[in-house]
Amino acid sequence: MKKEQFYPLGIFLAAMLGGLVRYLVSTWLPASPDFPWGTLFVNYLGIFCLIYLVKGYLVYKGTSKGLILALGTGFCGGLTTFSSLMLDTVKLLDTGRYLSLILYLLLSIGGGLLLAYYLGRKKW
């Protein structure tokens, strides 16, 4: 068997681990109806992991493609969550927390882009 045939399994297992980490972080951070700190934190953590992983891969090309796929697509994909971002956005909108909504979207999208840009330019 070719090792490429095992890539989906590695992605699947790593995504389960990423989802578990996301869940554990959400139980660790105090829940607040005013602001979804847990979602923001795991998305920032996912950005950090993905940028670190990609930069590391580009610097050290000896890393296995399967490992990169498992960690990038699997773990980081399971850790970060666009659907929770949207759900939290709708919850803030429905409850009339407009200032929190604007801040959340600015921090999530703008902050995420700035974090990715900063980490991408940083010399490790």
Swiss-Prot record:
GO terms for molecular function: fluoride channel activity; metal ion binding. Pfam families: CRCB. One of its GO terms (cellular component) is plasma membrane. InterPro entries: FluC. It catalyses: fluoride(in) = fluoride(out). It comes from the Bacteria. It is found in: Cell membrane. Na(+) binds at residues 77, 80. The chain crosses the membrane at residues 9-29, 34-54, 67-87, 99-119. Disulfide bonds: none annotated. Keywords: Cell membrane, Ion channel, Ion transport, Membrane, Metal-binding, Sodium, Transmembrane, Transmembrane helix, Transport. Its main location: membrane. Na(+) is not transported, but it plays an essential structural role and its presence is essential for fluoride channel function. GO terms for biological process: cellular detoxification of fluoride. It is a multi-pass membrane protein. Coiled coil: none annotated. Belongs to the fluoride channel Fluc/FEX (TC 1.A.43) family. Fluoride-specific ion channel. Important for reducing fluoride concentration in the cell, thus reducing its toxicity. This is Fluoride-specific ion channel FluC 2. The lineage of its organism: Bacteria, Bacillati, Bacillota, Bacilli, Lactobacillales.
